[in-house]
Amino acid sequence: MYGNPSIIMGRKKLGDDGMKEQTCCFTGHRTIPTDKMQEIIGKTEAKVRELISEGYRCFIVGGAVGYDTIAAELLFRLRDGEHLDIRVILAYPFDGYTGPWSEEQKATYARLLPLYDERICVAAAASRGAYLARDRYIVDASSACIAYCTRQTGGTAYTIRYAAKKGMPVCNIAEDF
C-alpha cells in the first residue's frame, strides 16, 4: 500500500532534500488528559490543515506514546483521505526504545510502523542523549512545530526551547486550555 519505507540509520538530514520549508515536526507529552483528548485532536487537526493549505507536505513525528501517537494517527487519516500528497516520517531515538512500553502501547506502535513513508533512526545506541538528539533532529529538519506542552521541564519543553532558539514558529495547542 505504501511501498517499502526507507529505514535510515544515522544522521541523514531531511532538510537536505529541499523540503525543510514544507516540513513540520511534532512534540508533546507522553501523558494526555483523557478529558481533553478530543479537543487536543481537533486543535491539532485544525493546525495541520492550516499548514497543508500553506504548502506543507512533510510531517515528522518522534514516535513516542501520547502526543506523537495522536499526531501520527491524525496524519495517516488525512493522508489516506483527502491529502494523498503528504508524507509522514518517523524519527526515532534508537532501536529498541519501545522496550519499557506496555503491551498495548507496543501493539499500537507495531500497527502504525508500516504506515510511515520513511523511518529514521537517529542514534546507534540507547541513551538519554539519544532522545535529545532525536528532538534536535526533527527541529533541524523542519520550519514549523506543533506542540502539546503544559510544563516547563522535560523533553517537550526542551524541544520547544530549541525550536525557538532556531527562530522556528511553534504552535503550542495547550496554551488554549
State what each model feature region is.
Residues 14, 18-177:
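Acidic/glycine-enriched connector segments
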Residues 2-18:
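Short, Lys/Arg-enriched N-terminal segments with co-localized hydrophobic residues
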